[in-house]
Each structure stands twice: as structure tokens, then as C-alpha cells.
Amino acid sequence: MDVPAFRERLLRLAPKDPLVLAVSGGGDSVALALLVKEAGRQAVVAHLDHGLRPESPLDQAFVRALAERLGFPFFTERVEVARIAQARGENLEAVAREVRYAFLHRVAREVGARAILTAHTLDDQAETVLLQLLQGTARATGIREREGIVVRPLLAHTREELRAYLRARGEAWREDPTNQDPALDRNFLRLFVFPLLEERFPAAKRALARFAEARAEEEGVLERQAEARLLPDPRFFVPAFRAAPLLEAPLAVRRRALRRLLEKLGLRPEARLVLLLEEALRGRPQTLPGGVLARRKGGTLFLLPPRPRLPLPPGFRRPAPGDYLERPSGRKRLVDFLAEKGVPRELKPLWPVRAEGSRVVEVLGLYPPPPEEAHMAEALAEAASAFREGEVPVGAVLVLPGRVLRAHNRVEGLRDPTAHAEMLLLREAGPEARGGRLYVTLEPCLMCHHALAQAGVEVVYGAENLKEGALTRFGLPTRARGGVRERECAKLLRDFFARLREGCRSG
């Protein structure tokens, strides 16, 4: 082991003391503690007894003695992991990992540590990559060198290198007998698969580690693109995302975005579950583990828990048979109104309403129309003007303190390819545009997206722009919100292009 090189790597990964060292008593973590001491860093030793083995008190005593010898403060807890896993009906290894990291983060908060060090090695990296490939998680990026405040400074070193380091110093370590149990997938790979691989391919572990490193770099780029495609639809009280940015994404980006969705739900990002979400995006509802229903309605992908819980503010109740709204256009049944607003059927019986008898006077978040609906109605009126003038029917309003500006596309009328509704409003507002909010019937194109971002204008749009949308077509990150009066915005565009096609046929 090259201690100076380790010192430099540790300084790069975790420049500030104190450090929290996760030490089980095994050879890897004992080597980590000794290396940190040799590097001259300040640290505390954290040891969690999982309550899984009769000899675990001996492990704790060994680690305590090691910490005292090194002059590091010692923190320990005992948690009955098997009991927790059984009560939850969850995988023992997954629960053990969750409990262990929760303990390490508590210790870090208590001592004010900026980094938690674990002793994962190149062997762990190779095993993890192969396990991920075999389990169908698809990413196969292995273990990250840094993840939040968790740092893994030994990923470049093999288990044998660390054992040689310990033997050269006459240091002892504890052996965990459960590491010899082939019933566990990781142990099976370590005990049987890798020995066979290394007979034929001696550099197999390093090759897998290099593969993981390259994949992690690629994944970082694709992850940022995938995250941009996850555009929440905040109108609903359950996880909901705009469907078009996902559907229009390149396959690799879409599947990464869907894996992120699975992780947000607390599910493993397995390939089969990603395929289920793709089916849901195409309009075929799918049930995920845990009873979560993935269903697309209109332009929104819903992830409905088995028992959705919607808030019931004081004075509100659940919908009842016969409920209706009295609107200027006439009476409308509540169930029809909720369907018009894109509320999935699973949420209709739960949506909070305030009523006088059967006459509904308020539908939470939907009626009376929120201000954004009124502003989008103004944008729709502008789009209708564009329609009548033979322009692509896109309208927009820019809401500023004390005034509202309105515009619609005038590309043909002005013979100016930049005369989009958004650009006309920015020109009119000038420096006052900063901090304003733009309501536009169609998702902005690349030109308008960049101009609005530079001007510091928040964007709310109606329909997705499948052909030129900055997010939907090109995947640019955005803080815009979409889907407001989506049906009306999309219908106006459909009607315009249908008339255009009819005119071409007539001509």
C-alpha cells in the first residue's frame, strides 16, 4: 500500500476532519482505520452490531480496542435487523444496509463530520458490477467513489492488497462466517464464480472495475438528461409527471428517467419494471410492486399508491353522488368536471370539495379556476387571434407587477422568423421582464427557451411541443410547468393544421 498516495486521494475526496470510519472488524475496514491514522487525519470509529450473529459482541469489543489503540473516539449501537426485516417483510440485506447507513449518518451529525468513509474495495466493485448485470438493473455502474457524504477511498485496491498491508504490520482482523454462505448472491460470486473467471481471465476484476468507471462517466451525462425529462405535474396530490417529455426522449434517456422514477418510489430499478412503466406511458395501466398503479391519463403519467391519501382541509368533504357545479355556461356534474380536468378515476371519489348541499362551490385547486387558468385563458384568446390571422396559433401573456402584456405569433404578418409570441413579449417588456411569469399555449422552442431563461422569466405552458419543444424535443433542463388547459391548447393547434392540410388539398 502506498500511504502517501492514499493520503492524497483522501485529501481530494474528504478534505476536512473529522471523518467517520465505518469499521466492522473485518480486514478491509481495519486496514481503512490504520491507513487513516497513518495519513494523519482526525476520525471517529463507528461500529453497528446488526444482532445477526452470536459472536457479534466479540466483534464490537475488537473494534473498540482498535479505536482506543489508534486514539479515535468510538461509537456503537446494536440493532435487531432481522426483526425489522421480518416486520416489514423486506430483504434482510437491504434492511441491514439501510439501518447501517442511518447509524453512520447519525454519528456524522453528532460529531459534525463532513465525510463517512467505508472500506469498499476493487473486489467489492467487481462483484457489484457483475451482480447488477445478472440482476438486470441495466446500469451496472457499480459503487460510486463518492455518494453524498459517503466516501470510498479504497476502491482502487484489492482485498488481497489490504490483507498484505495488515500482515506486514502484524495486525489482526475478524472474519465474518456469513461471508462463507453461498446462499447469498454476493458470496456465491466471490466463492465460486470469480475463481473460475480469474483462471481464464486473470484481470477480470480490474476489467469490471474499469467498465464501471466508464459507465459511471457516461451515466452522469445521461442522468442529467434523464432528470430533465422528469417534469412534475403539480396539479395533483399524488406523484404525477408530464408524459410527452418521457415519450419523446431517446430510448436510453427515457429508460434512465423511468429508473429514476422507480427509485423515487423506493423500488429497485429493474429492467422488467422499466418496461412496465413504458407500457403505462403508452396508455396501458400497469401495477408495480407494492400495489402502485402506473397509469397515463391525457398528458400525465400518474403513479397512484394503493390507498391514495388526499388532504381534506377544514370545511371540505369527499364527493357524493349527485354533486354538481353551477357555472356561467350551465350546470355540470362534478364527475364530468373532474374528468375534464384530467383527474384519474382512482382520485375522483377522494378529491376534496366544499359544497352547499349537492351544489359544489369549491373543488380544491381546480374550481374556482386558479389564477394560472385565467391567465392561460387570455393566452388562448391570443392564440385564437393568431388562428384567424393565418398564423400558427400560439398565444402568450406575460404577468408583471402591475400589468399584463399579451401577444401572439406574428411570423407571417411581420415576415420575421423570430416573431414568436414569447419573443414579442420580451421585446415589449425589456428589462422589466425579469421575475415575470409567462403563460404560453405551446411549450417554448429552443430560441424562446434560451431567451426566456436569459431574461429570468418563469414559464407555464399548455401543450407540449413535440416538434420543436426545448424539453420535449431536445431535452433541455427547464423549470417550466406544463399541462395547464392542455386540451384546449392542443385542440387549437390540431384544428389549425387540419385546416391547413385541407387548404393544401383544395389548392
Swiss-Prot record:
The keyword Repeat does not apply. InterPro entries: APOBEC/CMP_deaminase_Zn-bd, CMP_dCMP_dom, Cytidine_deaminase-like, Rossmann-like_a/b/a_fold, TilS/TtcA_N, tRNA_Ile_lys_synt, tRNA_Ile_lys_synt_N. The keyword tRNA processing applies. Zn(2+) binds at H420, C445, C448. Its EC number is 6.3.4.19. GO terms for biological process: tRNA modification. Signal peptide: none annotated. PROSITE patterns: CYT_DCMP_DEAMINASES_1, CYT_DCMP_DEAMINASES_2. It catalyses: cytidine(34) in tRNA(Ile2) + L-lysine + ATP = lysidine(34) in tRNA(Ile2) + AMP + diphosphate + H(+). It holds the Pfam family ATP_bind_3. GO terms for molecular function: ATP binding; hydrolase activity; tRNA(Ile)-lysidine synthase activity; zinc ion binding. Its main location: cytoplasm. It is found in: Cytoplasm. ATP binds at S24, G25, G26, G27, D28, S29. HAMAP family: tRNA_Ile_lys_synt. Ligates lysine onto the cytidine present at position 34 of the AUA codon-specific tRNA(Ile) that contains the anticodon CAU, in an ATP-dependent manner. Cytidine is converted to lysidine, thus changing the amino acid specificity of the tRNA from methionine to isoleucine. Belongs to the tRNA(Ile)-lysidine synthase family. This is tRNA(Ile)-lysidine synthase. It comes from Thermus thermophilus (strain ATCC BAA-163 / DSM 7039 / HB27). The gene is tilS.
